[in-house]
Amino acid sequence: MSSSGMPDLPAPLTNIKIQHTKLFINNEWHDSVSGKTFPVFNPATEEKICEVEEADKEDVDKAVKAAREAFQMGSPWRTMDASERGQLIYKLADLIERDRLLLATLESINAGKIFASAYLMDLDYCIKVLRYCAGWADKIQGRTIPVDGEFFSYTRHEPIGVCGQIFPWNAPMILLACKIGPALCCGNTVIVKPAEQTPLTALHVASLIKEAGFPPGVVNIVPGYGPTAGAAISSHMDVDKVAFTGSTEVGKMIQEAAAKSNLKRVTLELGAKNPCIVFADADLDSAVEFAHQGVFTNQGQSCIAASKLFVEETIYDEFVQRSVERAKKYVFGNPLTPGVNHGPQINKAQHNKIMELIESGKKEGAKLECGGGPWGNKGYFIQPTIFSNVTDDMRIAKEEIFGPVQQIMKFKSLDEVIKRANNTYYGLVAGVFTKDLDKAVTVSSALQAGTVWVNCYLAASAQSPAGGFKMSGHGREMGEYGIHEYTEVKTVTMKISEKNS
């Protein structure tokens, strides 16, 4: 254990044999009904890792049936003490911690994550999320209500039922934990569809679900494509809720499918173009580093990236200079290699999309300060890229890039920057850097975002809720608010012969 409290960093595993490539339904491994599989690739080498069974509508039907049976009244899961539910989630967290090295290595190979980041940050957060949720299992309580008349009234917080959970490829282990943790602690059953690009860690966790002792059907994991498996979950008449993290475009489709089927509950965490505002009175060293990490962590592949950076004009030139110096310090290469701190984008499609947006910045008149092109002859690498002299009407200032591209814009006044920061369809997170407390409170109140970080960035935690305003989605994940997204409140009122205070 290091002096910071983080575990020491071991070497990644070598010559890993992929053990789990089938669908996990009812605590058993299944081939797909269609017999189809799909390839999974290493984005750093472009080499195929393995083939994984491809879930389709028929496989989703099997998973939903298993989840529904596990949720029936009188089932082992429904009759289990809440404290025992919590113990199962604690056990799952312990098993993930035991297999931390394997999971971090898989995350690095399959998702292109820097190994140190996967091991020290992603897996650490995943374990903390599950333990936080485990602690909530026997603390979800209703209320007694002093209603008028000769009645006794109380509320129950009941599990919603069968929950579909769909998430993308940029943080597979974190997203898996943030989905299943709250759902399971409330007593729901789940059908998980990980991204087709990155199913391997979720499938290993499936084996740990069974080892931990969860009853059959409580957790089902069905890798597949969005238009088939994802659509089947969203439109299924026997799924009670769907939680989705991904693009706004797909989020709209999921909400529409939910409405047109059985009006299932929906939680959405969608696209973003997050403003980060640096005032002249900020600690410049700290602001440069936080803003840098905010956009370049995980090669910019983050819905909470600081992708719309506003810097007050009196410090603008120095801020740009320091940011460029920082961005030039990266070491590219295989994410498993010690010392490498900049990995690949997830696939060719994302690589091409990011490069197209970089080219648009050049054409529309932004000043390219560094980067601006691909790196290497193999793998989907893009150089950390910084643009200055960016204006609000440029595509790079308006569209979610999801890559290692920092746009630095200039502002003059507080009122101006608030208006410009809010001039977007999105509202997921924001950052504010200032030593002025009044300014910090004023701006954080005015920004239309579900999370505002002051003098920090990427400071997410299991205890704090996260979610979006506007087209960045609705509902919350994590914290007490996120737990209650997985319950229905039932009111029970009884006639009594006499009521006393």
Curated annotation (Swiss-Prot):
Gene3D superfamilies hit by this protein: Aldehyde Dehydrogenase, Chain A, domain 1 (3.40.605.10), Aldehyde Dehydrogenase, Chain A, domain 2 (3.40.309.10)
Gene (UniProt): ALDH1
Keyword DNA-binding: no
Lineage: Eukaryota, Metazoa, Chordata, Craniata, Vertebrata
GO function term, MF aspect, one: NAD binding
Active site: residue positions: 269, 303
Subunit description: Homotetramer.
Name recorded for this polypeptide: Aldehyde dehydrogenase, cytosolic 1
Cellular component, GO, one term: cytoplasm
